[in-house]
C-alpha cells in the first residue's frame, strides 16, 4: 500500500505532506538472509574471508556497521545533516558526456530505461566542494553527500549551503541535484 522502496514511498510522492508517521511495525524473516548483497558488503566478506553460503543476520549487521563507520562521520563527534542529497538521475547523453570528460570510472548505475543514476557525492567532489566549508556547513571529506556542521548557527545557514552546492554542481555539470531530507 505504501509502495516502499529504496529511499522512496507514497509519502514522498502522492501522499507527501498528508500524513505524519508516528510508528511502524516490521515483520522480520526467521530464515537466514540470502545474497547477493550490495557490493560493499560482498567486498567486506571477501576481504575478511567470511564465506557467504551460510551468512547470518549478525554478520551482515556487523559488516554494514563497519562499512558505515569507515564512510561516515561519527555523529557523536561531528554534527551533521546526514546524507543530504539524492543520487541524481541523468540521461544517457549526459552519462556519455561525463564518460568522455572523466573516463569510464564514473559511478553510474544503468536504470535500463535510457537513464542513469549517478553518485551525487562524486559530482560534489569533482565540483571541488568535498571538505570545503560553505555557510558553516561542509560536504564531509569521506562522503560528500553528508553535510557536516562546522559552524552553522541555524537552518538559514544550512539552506544557503544547500543552494550554493546545488548551484555549483549545476554550473559545472548541468545536473540538478535534489535534497534528500524532507522539511517539515
Functional labels for PLM-detected ranges:
Residues 167-168:
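Recognition helices and adjacent regulatory flanks at domain boundaries
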Residues 3-156, 172, 176-184:
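Phosphate/pyrophosphate- and phosphate-bearing ligand-binding catalytic cores of soluble enzymes
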Amino acid at each position: 500500500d505504501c509502495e516502499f522502496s529504496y529511499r522512496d514511498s507514497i509519502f514522498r510522492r502522492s501522499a507527501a505532506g498528508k500524513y505524519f508517521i508516528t510508528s511502524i511495525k516490521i515483520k522480520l524473516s526467521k530464515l537466514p538472509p540470502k545474497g547477493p548483497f550490495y557490493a560493499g558488503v560482498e567486498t567486506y566478506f571477501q576481504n575478511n574471508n567470511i564465506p557467504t553460503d551460510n551468512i547470518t543476520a549478525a554478520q551482515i549487521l556487523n559488516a554494514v556497521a563497519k562499512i558505515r563507520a569507515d564512510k561516515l562521520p561519527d555523529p557523536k563527534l561531528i554534527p551533521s545533516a546526514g546524507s543530504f542529497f539524492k543520487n541524481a538521475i541523468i540521461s544517457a547523453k549526459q552519462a556519455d558526456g561525463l564518460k568522455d570528460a572523466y573516463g569510464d570510472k564514473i559511478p553510474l548505475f544503468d536504470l535500463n530505461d535510457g537513464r542513469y543514476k549517478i553518485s551525487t557525492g562524486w559530482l560534489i567532489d569533482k565540483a571541488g566542494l568535498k571538505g570545503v566549508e560553505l555557510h558553516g556547513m561542509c560536504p564531509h571529506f569521506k562522503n560528500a553527500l553528508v553535510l557536516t556542521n562546522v559552524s552553522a548557527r541555524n537552518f538559514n545557514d544550512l539552506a544557503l549551503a544547500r543552494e550554493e552546492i546545488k548551484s555549483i554542481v549545476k554550473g559545472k555539470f548541468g545536473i540538478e541535484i535534489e535534497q534528500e531530507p524532507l522539511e517539515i
